[in-house]
Amino acid sequence: MAHKKAGGSSRNGRDSDGRRLGVKKFGGEAVIGGNIIVRQRGTKWHPGSNVGIGKDHTLFALTAGQVFFQTKANGRSYISVIPPKAAEAAE
């Protein structure tokens, strides 16, 4: 049994790269179907209308339109995509 640790080894130096999470398309931005809106761990943001959710909780646009963020009375943040016709009516 060795009484001294073998040289040439390092216990440090394992700082992994960031995962590139966060909002990719902000409120008011135009998106087309399939565009990623948010990459997240867990559901910080929930899918609203015309937004799908992937198995890793990525939110993506199901149709073309404008991104819309809102917080509902239950305290959850929702992201929706408003189609072009509805977006004009909302303005």
Swiss-Prot record:
This is Large ribosomal subunit protein bL27. Keywords: Ribonucleoprotein, Ribosomal protein. Belongs to the bacterial ribosomal protein bL27 family. GO terms for cellular component: cytosolic large ribosomal subunit. The lineage of its organism: Bacteria, Pseudomonadati, Pseudomonadota, Alphaproteobacteria, Hyphomicrobiales. It comes from Beijerinckia indica subsp. indica (strain ATCC 9039 / DSM 1715 / NCIMB 8712). One of its GO terms (molecular function) is structural constituent of ribosome. One of its GO terms (biological process) is translation. PROSITE patterns: RIBOSOMAL_L27 (PS00831). The keyword RNA-binding does not apply. SUPFAM superfamilies: Ribosomal L27 protein-like. InterPro entries: Ribosomal_bL27, Ribosomal_bL27_CS. The keyword Cytoplasm does not apply. Residues 1-22 are annotated as: Disordered.
